[in-house]
Amino acid sequence: MPVVFREGGYRFHFFSNEGDPREPVHIHVTKDGIDAKLWLHPEVTFAYNRGFDARTQRWIVSMVEARRAEIEDVWNGFFA
């Protein structure tokens, strides 16, 4: 499970087996047993959210938007 970055106790990562055919670029976020998955395109949106409150969801979206290029670089490098 490649970890792209950690911030404030949150782990931003993806899985090495992302389906066949592979799903589009996305990121998983976990903390304290709570998790979410976000699509990066066409805009950053939740695929699912399993427990993060609205304020935390807004923060997660802002983090992913700010680091979208980094996430894509790591994803593309891993799956190249």
Give the ranges of each region predicted by the language model.
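Negatively charged, low-complexity tracts enriched in Asp/Glu with abundant Ser/Thr
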Residues: M1-F12
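A broad, low-specificity signal for short, low-complexity segments enriched in glycine/proline
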Residues: M1-P2, P24, G33, W75-N76
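Generic preference for hydrophobic/aromatic residues in regular secondary structure cores
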Residues: V4, V44-Y48, R67
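A short, structured beta-strand/loop element
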Residues: F15-A54
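C-terminal structural segments of small proteins and small subunits
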Residues: G51-A80
